[in-house]
Amino acid sequence: MDGLDNTTRLLAPSSLLPDNLTLSPNASSTSASTLSPLPVTSSPSPGLSLAPTPSIGFSPDLTPTPEPTSSSLAGGVAGQDSSTFPRPWIPHEPPFWDTPLNHGLNVFVGAALCITMLGLGCTVDVNHFGAHVRRPVGALLAALCQFGFLPLLAFLLALAFKLDEVAAVAVLLCGCCPGGNLSNLMSLLVDGDMNLSIIMTISSTLLALVLMPLCLWIYSRAWINTPLVQLLPLGAVTLTLCSTLIPIGLGVFIRYKYNRVADYIVKVSLCSLLVTLVVLFIMTGTMLGPELLASIPAAVYVVAIFMPLAGYASGYGLATLFHLPPNCKRTVCLETGSQNVQLCTAILKLAFPPRFIGSMYMFPLLYALFQSAEAGVFVLIYKMYGSEILHKREALDEDDDTDISYKKLKEEELADTSYGTVGTDDLVLMETTQTSL
């Protein structure tokens, strides 16, 4: 009776194992014919098809990617190469994104981002905020790059590197996301226009309600067959918008009413963000491990490195083409290359079951890592050379004869006041003449 129970438990369907997976003969004493692969449900056309419930059907020539973990990547399934098809984890072992540690880390990061956005809201100048609203050239340029250039670039990169359907969808989702909070912090570090940066972040998140599903519908037909409505990330985008608008609005109010308190909040928010970044990198490395990172194809790493660079370059190029001021150029550049990876991760978790998304759940984190590193290099270059170049240009402008500077105006005022005045020698001579008379 105990043996029958063990066999029943072994053959019971598990939500963590792919349906078409053939277990190795040494997995149990049951014969291999009992564990033969089940027929795969075919979709109308090759690729993924999303149903109203979170189930995905693959065409016969496609195989879902099992979820790898650090403990399950040591070997492969029988008859499969371990580097291309890692062995699934134990059914009782949860995936790393469902562990209590990851949930606690998400809460910690969310609270730190709210504090950061509160501090960035305290940097907004209400007097200059309206000027960007009346003339939204920078915001329009950022939106053009965000929802025009980057989705097309992600689509072309997925085709050029011949990514599989799951990896291509992850890359495309990241390319269609709106701007993230990283751009606001980096704009502050490079002396950018904070009013423009916050306007671009808010406007891109609002536009994502319409343009993000549209871009996904246009570019994802090669891999996904699904109605447009099922890809609308309204809940995730609305939550992102609220977590951005509410702290920023409160920070603007504090700056308007309590100027000294706003300065203190800015310092505290920057310190908390630095601590958050350190903790985030340490905990992410602890949860993932080198084995999981090694399971990601090299082409995905190349895409994660190249996409932020292309976004930064396109934003700066468009801002230069429209003759924006230097601080606005840096702001548009950083806003275009920085994506909201938290939103991309949330959509991947909601739209795809864990057994199909597999290691491609890591792509938004890879993109966040490389976009932060590249933006950090940009900040270091600006701090080392940008300030000196700007000071030299200001000195050259003061020495230019065609420039009417404060120094020249001051010299002219001194010359005008000395014209027609009476010197000391002349005054003594006049007094002597009057005495003699």
From Swiss-Prot:
Quote the function comment for this protein.
Answer: Transporter for bile acids.
Q: What species does this protein belong to?
A: Rattus norvegicus
Identify the domain of life. Eukaryota
InterPro entries this protein is in?
Answer: BilAc:Na_symport/Acr3 (IPR002657), Bilac:Na_transpt (IPR004710), Na+/solute_symporter_sf (IPR038770)
Tissue expression as described in the entry: Mainly expressed in the central nervous system cholinergic neurons. Expressed (at protein level) in motor regions of the spinal cord and rhombencephalon, in mesopontine cholinergic neurons, the medial habenula, cholinergic areas of the forebrain, and the gut myenteric plexus.
User: Any transmembrane segments, and where?
Assistant: 104-124, 141-161, 198-218, 234-254, 268-288, 292-312, 361-381
Q: Name the gene behind this protein.
A: Slc10a4
| GO BP | adult behavior; bile acid and bile salt transport; regulation of neurotransmitter loading into synaptic vesicle; response to xenobiotic stimulus
Q: Sorted alphabetically, which PANTHER family does this protein's record hold?
A: SODIUM-BILE ACID COTRANSPORTER, SODIUM_BILE ACID COTRANSPORTER 4
Q: Report the GO terms under cellular component.
A: cholinergic synapse; dopaminergic synapse; plasma membrane; serotonergic synapse; synaptic vesicle membrane
The segment annotated Disordered runs over 16-84
Keywords tagged on the record: Cell membrane, Glycoprotein, Ion transport, Membrane, Sodium, Sodium transport, Symport, Transmembrane, Transmembrane helix, Transport
What is the protein's name according to its record?
Sodium/bile acid cotransporter 4
Give me the Extracellular side stretches, as residue ranges.
Answer: 1-103, 162-197, 255-267, 313-360
Q: Does the keyword NAD apply?
A: no
Name the cystine pairs: none
Q: How is it modified after translation?
A: Activated following N-terminal proteolytic cleavage by thrombin and/or proteases.
GO molecular function terms attached to this record: bile acid:sodium symporter activity
Kindly give the membrane topology term recorded for this protein: Multi-pass membrane protein
Q: What is its main location?
A: membrane
Q: What ranges does the Cytoplasmic topological domain annotation cover?
A: 125-140, 219-233, 289-291, 382-437
Instruction: Say which family it is in.
Output: Belongs to the bile acid:sodium symporter (BASS) (TC 2.A.28) family.
Positions glycosylated per UniProt: N6, N20, N26, N181, N195
Compartments in which it is found? Cell membrane
Keyword presence, Aminoacyl-tRNA synthetase: no
Annotated site (Cleavage): R87, P88
